[in-house]
């Protein structure tokens, strides 16, 4: 059966049981939730194909990125989907701290778009990670992202962020991995697994969203890994692999497990563990990423999502079950591989609790009764503090150079993942309980009728950006607000 929000909160308090929660990640040993997959939609069984990799050279990564609609095959069906450079997902970008990323984005869609480098701590100004840029159909825009020399390594990704079209474009296929390298781990191989979902009509068109799905956040009936349905992976016993897993779903929560194999967590988002932490499950809200080590044991296994109850709006919006299913299969056969070398300890992340707090704020997710003309399409209007997003309004003004404490509350009956652009958060309290470890995130799940407390370091990157719910139908409907740092 799927885990409930209440169980997740209770587990978050049980550090002695090896639970990894910290607002977004969850693992637990020996629980009766490892139910077999019940999903059967579509074809599968192809070998996993990883996206093409492009790397920076001499400190620069230059990319020509074309957003367009193309015909491809998904789950054995010809489909007309959205692509970056003709593929789903787009290329995997690999860079180093201190690098510059230059992207020429050409919009060949029939709606406006733009680009967000989710997870990068870079300038939000001008042609940087600026969510207020709008690139009309037929237009070209040149982006430049300058990574600081001390940018943390980790798993990031890129996707559109033009308000009002984000959910449709991500659901349609516009996303790709962005890896900031810098921490070396002895492994047999590394894999990038971009998990997404989509719904297709019988003739291969993307299913348009309905009003109840805006309320809950749509979940596709096909869950894909690197654009494939239930691909196959293979390895030898004794090998150790590094898996970079991205939840690129519009609204779906992923409760990942790989029964029969040995999993260790290196980090979530750009946060990192000092030493690998053994886990049985990892919970990724939409937008979260996991950096995992998989030590291979002989036999067949399934990479599964075990199901998560994210709440709902009752009769108005239905339930919010992110259901269980098989994402991929793994066959571990052949001769035993030589034992890999030890994983080196990693540098400690600075603890923001050691700095003085320059300001405190409380921010609330809200869903108010709407009208037929409102963003919620006659049901509920999502927002923050009772207001829907307005690009001409500044909701929070912050002085550059300080650390602030933000209390994020969620009085609604469903979970909301909170994402702050540019400035990473350190989770210090969830469910009224302190978080002991230094836990850095850029997406923090706020449970229904719950709250979390975070510290945000505004030491650099002045400019204007946003925070929002990463259930992207909610974001498009108004659950976003602006913050100006200066």
How would you label these PLM feature ranges?
Residues 156-161, 298-309, 461-472:
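Short, surface-exposed ligand- or partner-binding patches at beta-edge/loop junctions that are enriched
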Residues 41, 310-321, 369-380:
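Extracellular/periplasmic low-complexity linear segments
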Residues 4, 143-144, 411:
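Feature for soluble, non-membrane regions of globular proteins
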Residues 117-119, 125-130, 134, 265-276, ...:
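Active-site pocket scaffolds in enzymes
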Residues 11-16, 26-285, 292, 298, ...:
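Histidine-centered copper-binding motifs that mark active-site loops
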């Amino acid at each position: 059966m799927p885990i409930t929000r209440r169980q997740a909160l209770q587990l978050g308090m049980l550090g002695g049981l090896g639970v990894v929660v910290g607002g977004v990640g969850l693992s637990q040993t020996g629980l009766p939730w490892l139910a077999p997959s019940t999903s059967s939609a579509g074809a599968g069984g192809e070998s996993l194909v990883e996206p093409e990799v492009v790397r920076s050279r001499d400190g620069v990564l230059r990319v020509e990125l074309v957003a367009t609609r193309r015909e491809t095959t998904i789950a054995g069906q010809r489909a007309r989907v959205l692509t970056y450079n003709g593929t789903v997902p787009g290329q995997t970008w690999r860079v180093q701290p201190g690098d510059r990323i230059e992207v020429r984005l050409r919009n060949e869609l029939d709606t406006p778009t733009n680009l967000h480098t989710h997870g990068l701590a870079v300038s939000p100004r001008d042609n940087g990670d600026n969510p207020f840029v709008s690139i009309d159909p037929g237009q070209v825009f040149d982006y430049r992202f300058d990574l600081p020399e001390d940018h943390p390594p980790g798993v990031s990704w890129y996707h559109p962020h033009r308000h009002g079209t984000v959910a449709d474009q991500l659901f349609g296929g516009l996303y790709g991995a962005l890896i900031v390298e810098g921490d070396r781990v002895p492994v047999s191989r590394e894999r990038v697994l971009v998990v997404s979902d989509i719904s297709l009509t019988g003739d291969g068109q993307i299913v348009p969203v309905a009003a109840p799905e805006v309320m809950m956040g749509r979940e596709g009936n096909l869950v894909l890994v690197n654009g494939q349905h239930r691909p196959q992976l293979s390895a030898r016993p004794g090998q150790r692999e590094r898996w970079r897993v991205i939840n690129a779903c519009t609204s779906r929560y992923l409760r990942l497990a790989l029964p029969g194999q040995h999993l260790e967590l290196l980090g979530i988002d750009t946060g990192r563990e000092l030493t690998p932490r053994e886990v049985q499950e990892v919970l990724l809200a939409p937008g979260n990423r996991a950096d995992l080590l998989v030590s291979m044991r002989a036999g067949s296994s399934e990479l599964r999502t075990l199901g998560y109850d994210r709440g709902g709006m009752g009769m108005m919006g239905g339930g919010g079950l992110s259901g269980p299913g098989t994402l991929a299969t793994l066959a571990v056969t052949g001769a035993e591989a030589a034992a890999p070398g030890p994983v080196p300890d990693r540098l400690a992340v600075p603890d923001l609790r050691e700095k003085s707090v320059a300001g405190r704020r409380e921010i609330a997710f809200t869903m108010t009764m709407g009208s037929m003309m409102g963003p919620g399409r006659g049901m509920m209007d999502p927002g923050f503090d009772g207001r829907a997003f307005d690009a001409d309004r500044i909701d929070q003004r912050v002085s550059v150079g300080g650390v602030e404490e933000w209390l994020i509350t969620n009085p609604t009956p469903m979970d909301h993942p909170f994402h702050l652009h540019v400035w990473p958060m350190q989770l210090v309290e969830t469910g009224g309980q302190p978080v002991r470890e230094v836990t850095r995130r850029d997406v923090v799940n706020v449970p229904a009728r719950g709250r979390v407390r975070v510290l945000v370091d505004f030491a650099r990157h002045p400019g204007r950006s946003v925070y929002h719910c990463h259930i992207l139908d909610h974001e498009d409907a108004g659950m976003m607000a602006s913050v100006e740092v200066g």
